[in-house]
Amino acid sequence: MCGTDTGEETVMEYIRNEKNVKIAEAICEAIHENAAYLSEIDGAIGDGDHGVNMNKGFLMARERLRADMSFSESMKTISRTLVMDIGGSMGPIYGTMFSRIARACKQEEKLTKEVFLKALQDALQGLQELAGAKEGDKTLIDTLAPAIRAYEQAMQEGRSYAACLCALQEGAEAGREHTKELVAKIGRAARLGERSRGYLDAGATSCCIILTTMAHQMCTDILEK
């Protein structure tokens, strides 16, 4: 998990936007490390190429990241790369997710937990508008939506930034696991109907990897301050 700090917030906590490319780098590396796993999951009820396509896009994005980039610039770089260079439907989908995060953080010097919540909420809204999917359709939204709820609940309880990020991770993992119980309503897997039940959704799984990696690196930044 992201760290051991689960107490109440006692100081102003934030992540700097300027010259903060480490989070993007960690996400790209995590997708690379899990490429075979993602394709294996996708092969059960999909095309079996999710890991290949994701790895291709994120490796290209990693090559375009610069050490002097801000967090928002690095998110925009990932977005542009995925939209332009990744295959299948996931390029526009994840491109939208990272674009919305970048846009929400662009003008912010300090990425507080409130700023990050807004970025996540904007990302979710963008995905829903683009794909027409909703929670329960067995998509990455089934990871993102519960992750946001868990994060926001921790915020409302007055928890520290690190604790909110831990809650985000837990919500993402629970959402991913819940897709096993769902019947696919969108994409190729939807053709299988009830036969799609019992399997993880590949998009929900890659989204979980992205969110948990992002939270872990952000938490590391906070605790090292």
What residue spans do the PLM features occupy?
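N-terminal loops that bind phosphate or other acidic moieties
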Residues: 7-225
